Amino acid sequence: NILKHTDMKKGDYQAAIREPGLIKVEGWYSTPTVQHCHIENFICTAQMEGERIRMLSSTQIPHIVRRVVGQALGIDWGRVQIIKPYIGGGFGNKQDVLYEPLCAWVCMNLGGHLVKLDVPREETFVSNRVRHAIRSHIVSWVRPDGTFAARKLEAFSDQGAYASHGHSICAKGVGAFPQLYPCDNIEADGYTVFTNKPTAGAMRGYGIPQAMWAVECHTDDVAAKIGMDPIAFRRKNLMPVGFQDEFSKNELYSDTFNQCMDKGMAATDYERKYKEYQNQTGDIRRGIGMSVFWYNTAVWPISLETSSCRMVLNQDG
């Protein structure tokens, strides 16, 4: 049932874990399936105008819809017009071609009359897209001084019944794993797996929220295991200014991680509360924590993304 597998290696993981005195920390971390729950459900209309089919669609990807409708109907793309109005939310769910080809096909088979497909909330949950549930297994080998010697990730992404955006979400998350806390020796494997569940597709963050949840939960586990303050542990291991990822070529240009942590600690009175909330007992307990989040736009080099522009100059330049 494996749709796709991505592996990423840096250094020599097996040799690194033989370093004397290392502390091994491992754990499983899961994120659930989530539906986008945008206010406006999917809706589209189709009507023939001469030899052309004109569609109004609540979509995020009008150009891709045009191509897919043309391919599905076996007609030139130039005979398909997609009009995208302001939509009532999408958050990635409408970044897929959903019902437009069906709506267009019904229209053509009814003599070109106006056809509308208006999907109820129940069908949105079952037959649209959801966020990938991802289960991650992370192993870290840490020195007593709080630095990483080696790290390993295995991530299993629940794709549901159909491919949709497929493995790009899992691959994006796997690609982020070695970036937030750089390490010289890393092994990472990501598996996207078909299941008999609603199809997973794009949703805000595109795999990074699932990855960062796992990484940051694990980071707290590591800090607790070696007896180090979780903020100090993060500051020690976060990507430094000037860091460039070998795979994606992403580069960190400024020290915003530490700046954000400083402001967050000041705003929440973190240090006082962190000490006060230690060693509590009873049914009601208070706690305070902090996590950081690493996200970069687009999915390069997992996938090639393009854009275009048109420039018109006056005679005077």
Predicted regions and their residues:
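Structural alpha/beta core scaffold segments of enzyme domains
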Residues: 1-317
